[in-house]
Amino acid sequence: MSLPMLQVALDNQTMDSAYETTRLIAEEVDIIEVGTILCVGEGVRAVRDLKALYPHKIVLADAKIADAGKILSRMCFEANADWVTVICCADINTAKGALDVAKEFNGDVQIELTGYWTWEQAQQWRDAGIQQVVYHRSRDAQAAGVAWGEADITAIKRLSDMGFKVTVTGGLALEDLPLFKGIPIHVFIAGRSIRDAESPVEAARQFKRSIAQLWG
């Protein structure tokens, strides 16, 4: 089982605040996510600028595309994104359109499982050639005190068994990682737990050490 990658989510409102994070920890992570908040605040230039600074890193545009899949994904890929996200409630043709464009750029598409979705949809994504999904505990759910539970672990295992590469996100803390041991997680996303740490560098390194211990 290969080691899960570590992704930092830049859900900053401005590039200046995003750079405060990347200057510290870009070299400690595998994937740099231009979060939805930053995508809205700064547009695709955020993707372009971060990829120019860190060409050796995977840069994800978390656009959460809901419609106009080909147009919006092309905007992201032309800005040199490696991956883009499509929201789970989008029509299957939106996901297919985004994937078609991704292939032109040797990129990839992730389905963001935020909110309601069904296993029938999951099978449609697999049939369409989608390989990646993001299992998401929403920011609002976290704020309401909703913790990771057995239902989450069961769903993640089932998605993995279907052949998906599963990314896990949603207020992920270091102490949560053992919950997922034994599952071939593709990526763990840490946002505020790294960005807002007293030492973001040490926080990122602790995540990497824990991943190596649990999956190594």
Curated annotation (Swiss-Prot):
Induction: Induced by L-ascorbate. Repressed by UlaR. Disulfide bonds: none annotated. Gene3D superfamilies: Aldolase class I. Keywords: Carbohydrate metabolism, Decarboxylase, Lyase, Magnesium, Metal-binding. Binds 1 Mg(2+) ion per subunit. Belongs to the HPS/KGPDC family. KGPDC subfamily. Its cofactor is Mg(2+). HAMAP family: UlaD. Its EC number is 4.1.1.85. The gene is ulaD. Substrate binds at residues 11, 192. Mg(2+) binds at residues 33, 62. The lineage of its organism: Bacteria, Pseudomonadati, Pseudomonadota, Gammaproteobacteria, Enterobacterales. Pathway: Cofactor degradation; L-ascorbate degradation; D-xylulose 5-phosphate from L-ascorbate: step 2/4. InterPro entries: 3-keto-L-gulonate6Pdecase_UlaD, Aldolase_TIM, HPS/KGPDC, OMPdeCOase_dom, RibuloseP-bd_barrel. This is 3-keto-L-gulonate-6-phosphate decarboxylase UlaD. Catalyzes the decarboxylation of 3-keto-L-gulonate-6-P into L-xylulose-5-P. Is involved in the anaerobic L-ascorbate utilization. It comes from Salmonella typhimurium (strain LT2 / SGSC1412 / ATCC 700720).
